[in-house]
């Protein structure tokens, strides 16, 4: 599994955020029984940085907490039988790892939301990574029934990791 972390801004978390991110990504891969080694990229930025990305790629002119850019196209969320390791579009030709996608998180939003939800910065950070990983597995929350499934999975993952509110 390849996990790449890019820091566009200074990160002043009071915990090992690289280790936590790796743990959450690994746990999510195991949770959905992802059948291949995977590649995931995480970029940590600020509100200005995520605002620019949100505007460019989603045409939404404001910062957000997390953006997910899945590289795979799913017919059914969390169902991976469509993947073919002979298909070079889905796999890194150098490593053979499935290209899951990119996660972008606003550090400022992590702090803001941790305070507003009344839980730790560490928990908010882990939640946003979990949320985004589920998007990389094809889950969404546009419809009420989809949102319920995604919320239940997020809660279950964080509870099993003992990352509680």
Language-model regions, residue ranges each:
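An acidic/histidine-cluster motif and surrounding catalytic segment
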Residues: 1-126, 137-165
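Conserved ATP-binding N-box helix of the HATPase_c
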Residues: 134
């Amino acid at each position: 599994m390849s996990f790449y972390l890019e820091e566009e801004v200074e990160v002043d978390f009071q915990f090992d955020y690289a280790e936590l991110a790796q743990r959450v990504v690994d746990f999510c891969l195991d949770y959905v029984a992802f059948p291949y080694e995977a590649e995931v990229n995480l970029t940590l930025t600020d509100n200005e940085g995520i605002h620019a990305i949100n505007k460019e790629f989603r045409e939404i002119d404001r910062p957000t907490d997390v953006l997910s850019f899945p590289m795979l196209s799913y017919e059914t969320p969390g169902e991976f039988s469509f993947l073919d390791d002979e298909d070079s579009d889905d796999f890194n030709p150098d490593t053979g790892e499935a290209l899951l996608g990119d996660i972008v998180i606003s550090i400022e939003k992590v702090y803001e939301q941790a305070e507003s939800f009344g839980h730790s910065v560490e928990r908010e950070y882990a939640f946003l990574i979990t949320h985004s990983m589920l998007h990389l597995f094809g889950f969404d929350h546009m419809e009420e029934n989809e949102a319920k499934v995604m919320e239940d999975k997020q809660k279950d993952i964080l509870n099993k990791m003992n990352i509680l509110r």
